[in-house]
């Protein structure tokens, strides 16, 4: 083999290895965009965790209304109202973070496709596009994992707000007693919402680990 052919072969191998190492996106800006996408996933995940805590707080305040109905449920009801408002606010933040994450992912994969379109080596380009399609499919699986949560949360939140209105007009012992069935339903449905949150959190962890390059833990 001539020196010139050897150099060309080594260059091709090096290019191929670099592409494989970064899952098809061999530029600094590319992995930074992947990190940004990972950060978006982490922020979305964090808001969902906050949502779980907000549900716990809401259910706790609802229980306190039931236990204090025969004495003085006013303070417990005020806390319940605050918890419902906080939960609604947190839900808005989850939606916002979800949109941010989606936009960052879209930018990441668009940049990846653009850069790989400029790659001259057909083998490298083919590998890169194959990896991109696989990871993009993984990223888009987040939306599917979020569907049960979206389907459950809206009706449950509406039920909580309706219960809040009911109690605000009838916080008597008899009124609270009459709403016991609604209390039980709110708790049961809230637990199902949290299960869907757990499933989505697990999916987000998996996707983030798949999309972003490995990073050493801080010492």
Label the predicted regions.
Residues 29-40, 154-219:
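Long amphipathic all-alpha helical oligomerization modules
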Residues 86, 133-137, 185-189:
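A short structural micro-motif
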Residues 26-89:
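Immediate post-signal-peptide N-terminus of mature secreted/exported proteins
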Residues 27-29, 61-79, 111-130, 174, ...:
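Amphipathic alpha-helical hairpins
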